[in-house]
Amino acid sequence: MELALVGNPSNGVAKPSCNSVGSLPVVSSNAVIHPPVTSAAGATLGRHLARRLVQIGATDVFAVPGDFNLTLLDYLIAEPGLKLIGCCNELNAGYAADGYARARGVGACAVTFTVGGLSVLNAIAGAYSENLPVICIVGGPNSNDYGTNRILHHTIGLPDFSQELRCFQTITCYQAVINNLDDAHEQIDTAIATALRESKPVYISVGCNLAGLSHPTFSREPVPLFISPRLSNKANLEYAVEAAADFLNKAVKPVMVGGPKIRVAKAKKAFAGIAESSGYPIAVMPSAKGLVPEHHPRFIGTYWGAVSTTFCAEIVESADAYLFAGPIFNDYSSVGYSLLLKREKAVIVQPDRVVVGNGPAFGCILMTEFLDALAKRLDRNTTAYDNYRRIFIPDREPPNGQPDEPLRVNILFKHIKEMLSGDTAVIAETGDSWFNCQKLRLPEGCGYEFQMQYGSIGWSVGATLGYAQAAKDKRVISCIGDGSFQMTAQDVSTMLRCGQKSIIFLINNGGYTIEVEIHDGPYNVIKNWDYTGLIDAIHNSDGNCWTKKVRTEEELIEAIATATGAKKDCLCFIEIIVHKDDTSKELLEWGSRVSAANSRPPNPQ
């Protein structure tokens, strides 16, 4: 159901983001968060914003200083429980907030006006596409300069300061431009509440002369941050459960597939519950890996059309009914729109909507409540899983390399698989790491993240920084190609400053391999770097870092043993040198199909 948003329509714009609206990522749906008591003298705008970030769990803010946000940064630093992390550039600060939100449920970044805001824009767009609540804070112009026809620095030379705001309007679910104190409290609280409720980024611009000022609205006690709960329409819920149960109970060999919107719906537990009670085999869409329990006894792998896990596509596409929870069917996840699925066989469950076959459709239904209720109505049916067991033949492990034989990528990932546990998390960069990491069977508690919808190469460096900062109980294992790394390498420096102990596998194959398989050309070849030498230079004997260049399996085994043993408390950077044409068979198949989809001729006019 839609909830009323309170705000100043001239400064804040509230709008529904899409159908992927679920329950809250950090706080419970009826949470009232009480701030600590403060005196009126200390109740400034900057402190109010900082305090709110701490209350929602964003206890680290990734920032790049600029003259418009310096005073605000002082207040963020001064807030107990809040840590300001300086990044090398705004893009990586945004990527770090993205990674942080994946682990913590919400992230935050702070940049300066326009030159910083437009630089972080790409990362915020990625967070929007992945349904991640990121609070993007911008230090804005002095409030006295609005409407004066003055031309300011850090702008495009026009007296109108709205260019940055207009850019953010399409990639955030709420925008607050705070250029007066009277409604600043309301605007900040509305923006943060909207980010949590919609699970999308928001934009908050704070005038550079306002952060240190007090206002009576900041000193009222208590000042709760109230998040209005989302509730299912009970009648619709009952009808939807009845229709879906009747549809699925008539099927002979139904299956279940988890999609990426399970995250925004906070439905991981509900999905696991219905999987347990129904007896159906469970698969996962590639963009939802890590959201579905792969240790479950009836887990059959990744459903990704022609590049699915062995025998998974055969079971899913031959089913006479499939329950998809939170799917996104884009050109990447559908392998160029080549999935062999039929809508009339599907029950599609989105975070707030259910569609049974070709109809009917039921709105205002929370995924969690629907799956919990449906689990009680389904007849147990293991037929599809029994079929899977009859045809399943385990994949063979790649043979061990010969002494001094050049290392192969499949050998690398065989050894990465052995590193995984509930105390690790995998970050997979856009590229061949997508396909190789999909084959990793995740143990219980092992995290997994990648950016499939937006697919911005270089994302994983900042995301590794943010995820590791948020999930300090896990050791992050990051797999990134050389081309992607050249986009965002600088913030390995920030990892060292933060004392992180991630393991980064830099796969050096001399170019943009994923682009080669879609459409080759000389533009896909890059200048080779001495990557370990670069990290050693960034390290500069300041921090805890270990690097290694690996060319053979024997060297890889030794490097992993060191990274997980003597150097377990270090940031470990392992450069893997492989042949430029050493790619997974899945990338070859996927690339050819996506290329075909991209090169379709125009429709006749």
Swiss-Prot record:
User: Biological process (GO) annotations?
Assistant: aromatic amino acid family catabolic process to alcohol via Ehrlich pathway
Q: Which N-terminal stretch is annotated as signal sequence?
A: none
Binding locations of substrate: D67, H154, E515
The coenzyme or cofactor needed here is:
a metal cation; thiamine diphosphate
Stretches the record annotates as Thiamine pyrophosphate binding: 432-514
Q: What is its EC number?
A: 4.1.1.1
UniProt keyword annotation of Acyltransferase present: no
What family does the database annotate? Belongs to the TPP enzyme family.
Put simply, this protein is called: Pyruvate decarboxylase 1
Originating organism: Oryza sativa subsp. indica
Q: Which gene encodes it?
A: PDC1
